[in-house]
Amino acid sequence: MHNQTVRATVFKANAAAPQTKQIYEDDFSELYGEDIIAPPYNIIELKTIAEYSTILQQCIDAYRVNITGFGFDVEYTFDVNASDVDQAKKKRAEKDWARLEAFYKCLHFDESAEMILGYAIEDREKTGNGFMEVLRDGAGKPAGIEYLDVKYMRVCGAGEPVEVSFVYEENGKMKRIKRQKRFRKYVQMINGKKVFFKEYGDPRKMDIRTGEYVNTLAEKYQANEAIHLKIGSGVYGVPRWIGNIVNLYGARKAEELNFMYFKQGRHVPAAITVENGMLSEASYRELQEYMNDLEGVENAHKFLLIEAEGIAKEKDLHGGEDITPVSVEIKSLAEILQNDALFLEYDEKSRNKLRSAFRLPPLYTGEAQEYNRATADTARKITEEQVFQPERKTLVNKLNTLLLPELNIHDVRLTLKGPDFRDPLEIAKVLGPFITAGAVSPNDLRDLAGRVLGKTLEEWPEDIYKRPAGQDAEKTNLAALMQELKESIEDIKTS
């Protein structure tokens, strides 16, 4: 008795799957050692990975825009309008204000300082690291900044401790102390040419060509300083989304699979079973050619003709052959494949995970379908409070700590502005009882009126406008004025 055998033949397209032609080669690979430290991840790949994601770049743009997009501003480090403030200190603070305002406006002549800082923040969010070069003027004071592309930068080991001066304020007086600090070096390499930078604040002279510290050196060979903005406390920063890198690549593969589906047209996977017969050689070749020519919508609707040959039995008494009847069945395998809903669910979960790594609501990435005004305002305020305000504060504190002491500016500081969520109409309603009680002076309301009118209003110099209504003989009907202001705002909103 002969055993029955089953032969399986798989038909598939001969076309190779598309493969990336990019090479994430590290030009520093042969230079890593005791001096130049290797990063934990491939910097070039991290720099370009946002091009393969449908959500990562939106999250990075949200950070860059909301941290630096509202611009720099200057604020006093003390209450300049307090009655006990010394006039000499007040004048000194006003001069510092003008100097600092001119400083940040002239940090870069081609682009704004916010734009250069934004480039570094974008690098930091992509790779965990961002760099800026600091330029000094002839007097040795910081005078400008330049963007340093992170993919060309590497960090070197820390050197021996160096004695540096540190200026701080105590009881209203500036004091200076000496302390020991270890500085790092940074190296940039483009097309095989290396350029060294020293960490900002390093008082030593460094050769830009070799990275060696020297006592005397021509000015053109002296290395400039660099500021390293990083996420984390390591030698290199680590991007906040690095734990989701598998989801990022998985979502990309799902998108590529869908693209190939639409590119090649609708071709249902199927099993063709032939019973009591064999597929003819011609049918076999036709099936293989059909699979090879899958690509293109013009091949999406074709008729398939299958020819099978029955198996001949033994000859009968008259010499003829009895051919067994052939049964051909096509069984669809589409139902065992993952459906489109699973891909959509995977993509949505991947987007949510990446967005969660940045702690951003969908509103900040252009996905606001389920928001109304109340929920949108709540999402904006919570994100501003929990994410962007701390980021601005951390960043600007670093800049103030590094730059202002060398500029001899101590009474004012840089700030990064944020959005203004205040509604003048709501503020006017709240101020009503205070105005009626005589607790607000006209000058206290000039800033509010300026925001309503869209221009800056200076305070009135007369003393009468510096005191609340009702404390002077010449009373003004401030409550009526506020009522008119509220009505004007309502008319503007309804018009």
Swiss-Prot record:
Q: Which domain of life is it from?
A: Bacteria
Q: List the disulfide bonds.
A: none
The protein's matches in Pfam families, at most eight in alphabetical order, are given as: Phage_portal
Among InterPro entries, the record links this protein to: PBSX_Firmicutes, Phage/GTA_portal, Phage_portal_PBSX
The family annotation for this protein states:
Belongs to the phage portal family. PBSX subfamily.
What is this protein's name? Phage-like element PBSX protein XkdE
Report the source organism: Bacillus subtilis (strain 168)
